[in-house]
Amino acid sequence: MRRSPLKTMLTVLAAGCVLVIQAPIAAAAAAQASPAGSEWPRHGLDSAETRFSPLRAIDTASVAQLGLAWHFRFDRPRGVEATPIMVGGTLYVSGPWGVVYAIDARNGRLRWQHDPQVPAGKGIHACCDVVNRGVAVEDGRVFVATIDGRLQALDSSDGRLLWSTPTFDPELPYTITGAPRVADGLVMIGNGGAEYGVRGFVSAYDAATGALRWRFYTVPGNPAEGPDGAISDLPLQALALPTWQGEWWRYGGGGTVWDAMAWDPELDLLYFGVGNGSPHDRDLRSPGGGDNLFLSSIVAVRRATGEYVWHYQTTPGDSWDYTATQHMILAELEIDGAPRKVLMQAPKNGFFYVLDRATGELLAADKYVPVNWASHIDPASGRPVEAAGARYPAGQPFMVQPSQLGGHNWQPMAWNPHTGLVYIPAQENVGFMMKEPDFRLEPGRWNTGVPNPPVPPDAAIIDQARQSMSGHLLAWDPVRRSAAWRTPHAGPWNGGVLATAGGLVFQGVGGEGLAAFDARTGERLWQSDTWLDILGGPISYELDGEQYIAAAAGFGSSIHLSSSVLLPRRGGNAAGGVFVWKLGGTAPMPEAESLPMRAAPPDTGSATAVRRGGELYARYCMQCHGAGAVAGGGIPDLRHSPYLAEASLFRRPLVEGLLAARGMPSFADTLAADDADAIRAYVVRMAHITRTTD
């Protein structure tokens, strides 16, 4: 929903009728603050986050000649989601745990490396792996945010630490996985952790000194404790507080700003997307209802001060984990014969939004994937018209589309002003939503209020679940408000997108490496199998007259960890890296690394033990070790663990803390010995059932 600027924030404005969008503005106007194109200086190439490269040497005619120029391997496993930055002939890329690598962009030689030395135990608070989506570079400084909440500035020439500042208390279950954004001397960063019961905020720091300049909290705190003394105090009091009920602060509230931001230098507005509530089920966190601002909202603030300007809430009172943290693109479209500055987003809830980015006015909202939780977005109010039963009242489960994975997750999309199309890594899925019986808050643990049912020990059911999910590259026309084309993929979890002036769209395809598609038709023109999945956005740059395509690759991310059993190629413990292609490249592709395999112990668990073990596994183990006990990204696969051989061995890391120093927490305060034995029985059963998936 749209709200007025701060000075009239108590007045609710009508969104008005949806206007007819006529045509995109010329390409030169669409890529705001766009560089010449030889470098890739920002996360989304430019401040508008278009991810559109003007380079055209690699085009639809020449792309078949692309070959590997070089590759660089990281020195540790876990998830890789970064978009590289290329400035001054150096490629800056972050790997797992926020380790930064500076690499010669011509030949792949390491120039320097910075390891922030994050304690291994902090990984327990990372819902979706210890990933890092990238760095920011400006004025000779490289900025990176670490999993344990430090924002650091490094010397771009040698990696020396220039300053480091904590952005939150590392003892709290916050994390950071997002890339910082730099805008006119300020570095902006948010955080994650809503599933663990935190309160979200975004902060701006002085790029030269690391001093905090402003902070904007996205949900209200405990009213009894008074205001925060932050720039968000007034909008929280006037707009957000009336939309919450009960004692939401006991659960944290959520609303973390864990990914997308964009900046309009002309308006000098910073836009950020806000995440889901904590817990997910609104009836738990806010009994009595309410929109729960600013959850699932796009918020515009003044860059220099953080002062609130407007917001639009994509999913009022979110109960489905429908974040608005997905990639936002700034562009100009012609509406009723006049140019309008717009913001475009395809958030998890399945609707594609076009907003006036100066005012927050809703211009269009249309389904881009199958959606059943709402029939449409009402153009007058800007609110979704919800389906009966969508909020899964007690005793009435609901099969929701999209699922909590969303129609589009964090993987970046791209905008091509020449074709007038937005290219989206879209996905179709269904989620089972029901209230968690006897919910109890477990501080520092996974607290969504929605149970994770265990994967049953039945190969046919697993195959059905696999078939219920799909992914595709979607070309969306914001003028016609419809899909121009869709190209299906083999699996549901695919990578970010790069569009180029050569008429190409590059995307990482799950289980298949990097592929290039015709931007006008969606035809696949080229593919290179890296055997490591590419999830972050590919980039393009030019050196010595040659155009390069680069992408970071690796196993990890939330789906590799939690749902690898559903993917066409499951991950492993291999370290990720960077792959770079050019026309005529002849470097050999590194060979795929084999997965460690062990014979499963005899399956002697009773049906009761396996059923109970599956429930416990889904609650405490699945998020890291994978649904159905099939792991997929740097964390050991328990089916092949030496500790699985005997019950007494299996208890040692689980309840005795044997591997705590390596990041495996002890569950002694939660699980008894017989609980550990039941979990082992489930893992052994799944090892026998899923052995063919390896």
Positions of predicted regions on the chain:
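Short, conserved, GDST-rich strand-edge loop motifs in beta-rich repeat architectures
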Residues: 189-200, 245-246, 272-292, 397, ...
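Repeat-blade elements of multi-bladed beta-propeller folds
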Residues: 40-44, 79-99, 124-150, 175-196, ...
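Extracytoplasmic beta-rich repeat domains
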Residues: 72-83, 113-136, 161-179, 217-260, ...
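Electrostatic cytochrome c docking/interface patches
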Residues: 592-616, 694
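Blade-level signature of beta-propeller repeat domains, shared across WD40, Kelch, NHL, RCC1
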Residues: 539-595
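C-terminal capping alpha-helices of c-type cytochrome domains
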Residues: 145, 668-694
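Blade/loop signatures of beta-propeller domains
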Residues: 31-68, 227-235, 386-388, 462-463, ...
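Gly/Gly-Pro-rich "capping" loops immediately C-terminal to redox-active cysteine motifs
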Residues: 614, 626-659, 663-666
